[in-house]
């Protein structure tokens, strides 16, 4: 497989000053909306101040100490520098690489411990605010059922940051998080154990082949996964989400903005692809997600963009 490793010193597309202003305005609008929806009690205001600052303060020097390793991989254009002890047969081929030059890919405790801090640095502290954009459409579609002990599956849950937002908005829900990485699930367990209430069920597995029976979930969420999947894998994940949802169940999908919905930020998307190792990003930003949803059997309800995130809401007919 061609991993599409970026150049060691990637040339970038110039970002004009006016675009920087538009990015700043878009980020401010996201943060204002986040505060407004918390004030409307869609989720606790405490979630807006939920970042583990003391933990990150300890790990921040580790991010800097990791930079020489990242630069060495970039120089070698090595995007398959993974822990030797992993069994590669346990993972799909597209997963076995150093996405955005992450040390160990997604396959070590060290990677899992640094990941959330690295993402917040990249997105200027807005990652959780973007994750919370799935809450309003999810609650709207659930209606009165939001107070019931419904089952909600989060595909590619990673370190559990989305589950943490969902726990705040749906305190009675039975939450399930699925991820390919045992290391990231261990980190998720640590984060989620800090909050009151029932601990979400954490399951190691592949979104293309969900280990659940047909029609057992009332809602499915999936955040920041699709841009790291080849097209056929995206379709399989949607097919599986449709399968495990009950008739009338809701899917809320959040991922990077795309060229069609945010053409103004095209240079930013191009630079993201060039600088970071994101081998499927170019294909993703041109992909027709509503068409894929319909192909799986979903009815697309709405799609909206917030800063760097696009959110699609869809329902399984029945």
Residue map of PLM features:
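Conserved class I S-adenosyl-L-methionine
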Residues: 148-158
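N-terminal accessory segments
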Residues: 1-89
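A short acidic, Gly/Pro-enriched loop at the edge of an enzyme's catalytic core
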Residues: 208-220
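A short SAM/SAH-binding and catalytic strip from SAM-dependent methyltransferases
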Residues: 218-232
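A short glycine-rich, Lys/Arg-flanked "PGG" loop and its adjoining helix->strand segment in the class I
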Residues: 235-247
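C-terminal alpha-helical "lid/dimerization" subdomain adjacent to the S-adenosyl-L-methionine
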Residues: 235, 252-296, 300-306
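Class I SAM-dependent methyltransferase SAM/SAH-binding core
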Residues: 153, 161-209
């Amino acid at each position: 497989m061609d991993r599409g490793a970026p150049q060691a010193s990637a040339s970038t597309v110039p970002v004009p000053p006016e675009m920087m202003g538009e990015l700043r305005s878009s980020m401010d609008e996201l943060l204002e909306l986040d505060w407004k929806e918390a004030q409307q009690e869609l989720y606790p205001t405490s979630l807006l101040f939920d970042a583990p600052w003391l933990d990150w303060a300890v790990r921040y020097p580790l991010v800097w100490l990791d930079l020489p390793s990242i630069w060495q991989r970039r120089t070698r254009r090595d995007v398959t520098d993974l822990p030797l002890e992993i069994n590669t047969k346990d993972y799909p081929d597209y997963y076995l690489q150093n996405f955005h030059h992450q040390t160990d890919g997604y396959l070590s405790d060290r990677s899992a411990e640094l990941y959330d801090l690295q993402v917040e640095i990249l997105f200027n502290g807005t990652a959780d605010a973007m994750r919370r954009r799935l809450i309003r459409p999810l609650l709207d579609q659930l209606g009165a059922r939001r107070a019931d002990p419904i089952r909600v599956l989060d595909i590619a849950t990673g370190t559990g940051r989305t589950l943490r937002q969902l726990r705040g908005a749906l305190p009675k829900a039975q939450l399930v998080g699925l991820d390919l990485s045992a290391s990231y699930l261990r980190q998720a367990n640590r984060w989620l154990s800090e909050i009151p209430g029932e601990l979400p069920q954490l399951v190691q597995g592949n979104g293309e082949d969900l280990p659940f029976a047909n029609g057992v979930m009332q809602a499915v969420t999936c955040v920041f996964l699709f841009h790291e999947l080849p097209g056929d894998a995206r379709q399989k994940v949607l097919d599986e989400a449709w399968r495990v949802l009950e008739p009338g169940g809701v899917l809320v999908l959040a991922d990077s903005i795309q060229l069609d919905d945010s053409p103004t930020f095209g240079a930013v998307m191009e630079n993201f692809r060039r600088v970071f190792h994101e081998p499927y990003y170019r294909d993703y930003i041109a992909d027709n997600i509503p068409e894929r949803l319909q192909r799986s059997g979903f009815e697309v309800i709405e799609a909206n963009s917030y800063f760097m995130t696009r959110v699609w809401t869809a329902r399984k007919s029945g």
